Structures are given as C-alpha cells and as structure tokens.
Amino acid sequence: MYGMQYIQQTIVGIDGSEARFFGYVADNSEEMEPDRIRPAILILPGGGYAMTSDREAEPVALQFLAKGFAVFVLRYSVQPSRYPVALLEAAEAMRLIRANADQWHVNPAQVAVLGFSAGGHLAANLATSVGDEDIREQGGMDPDAVRPNALMLSYPVITAGKYAHLSLIHISE
C-alpha cells in the first residue's frame, strides 16, 4: 500500500535539552517507481535561537515533500541552551538520516540542509569546518560524515564584524 511514514524522534542535547526531529517520507509504490531513492532535505527553522518558527518548518517541509523529497525538520534546542548544543543536534539529525537511508528510501549522498535566519547560521556551521572540533570532541561524530551535500540559506545570520547579530549568538562560557 502506498502511503507515508511520519517519523518522530527526540534528540537529547549535551545539556539535557530535547530537540524534536520529524520526518516526512513517502512510501514507494509498486505501481510507480518501486525502487525509488529520494534526495533528502533537513530543515532548520529560524527564531533567533529563542524559538523555532512554525512557518519555516512543516509548511516548507510539505512543499518539498510534494516535489519528491524525503523531508526532515529539526526543532533544535534554543535558549537557555548554548553553543554547541544545537550544532550537535543538527549533526545527530544528519547522522540519523544517513543511518536510516535504506529504510527511508533516501540517497545518503544527496542530503541538503535548508536553514532560515538562526537556522541558516546553524546550517552554515554544520556545512563548514567552523564546528568540526565540537562535532568530533563533544558529539563523538566524524564531521565529514554529517556534513550536508548541499546547502540552502534563507536570510541567514552569518554577518560578522560591525553588523554582526551578536545578541543571537549564545556561546558557552
């Protein structure tokens, strides 16, 4: 029978916080492409690291699902959690997607991350070497194994210097 898998998991942060991981994965139909392997997208909603926006989560996920993607949304930990909690949760979400690629009919070499605002900041950190040491040492993961194959940034918080969004970047002390 043709349908959809709805995936819900909790990712526990290094500070004990709980991120929510959701997935929308269409089942393969025996009538239509029974062996179809889909590209995947991990969506990281924005919200200034104070919340994760509803409008940048499921509504966006459903649009990509309709285009044939396996789609995942991470409601990562926000305040009072501090860096690198959300980064490690995003890395774990990428690990989960690739570890379950066969079951979820996902091409592990075609996993993109889409981040909005603060989620764009998080996505950029995951995609570059910025957080590699934290991913390796605190997350116990190989940064290259959890790095996305493609990146989409929607009004990301990545400005440095004079116009930086310093109030949004919460670093552990």
Where are the model-predicted features located?
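Short beta-strand element of the alpha/beta-hydrolase
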Residues: 37-46
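Short amphipathic alpha-helix adjacent to the substrate-entry channel of hydrolases
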Residues: 55-72
